[in-house]
Amino acid sequence: MSTVKSALAQKSGALIHVRSGDMVVEALLQMRDNRVRSVLVIDDDVLVGIVTQGDCAIKVLLPGLDAKQTPVSQVMTGNPVTVKPDDPLQGCMAMMAARGFRHLPVLDAGKVVGVISIGDVVKDVIRDLEHNVDDLVGYIMKDGPGG
């Protein structure tokens, strides 16, 4: 299985983020415009949290709060668990499954370099399985029919 760095290389676009003082509506607009389900919360180049669509639904929509008046700091998950570029994706998958995470911010020497989603991990698993199938077919066909 690949590393976090290789999964990040498959992604395109800029790092999507908001500030903790921004209103939730800004985080939702970023998610909609960039077709993502979470945004990192970064203040002064420091990761302070992550906010997801689920956070917004449960902490803003359900209680009847106004997304235009509610700061991201009120709904974000502060001090999120992070991973490093050289971490194996298999470890990320295990952590996501065990802790119920769908997104993991990636830090390199304390600097935010991206975010890994469960979708990124699944794509990598599928690529690995496809390679395994190709290898097995090649092995089986090597000797021809009937071996």
Name what the model sees in each region.
Residues 1-147:
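Tandem CBS (Cystathionine beta-synthase) repeat/Bateman regulatory domains
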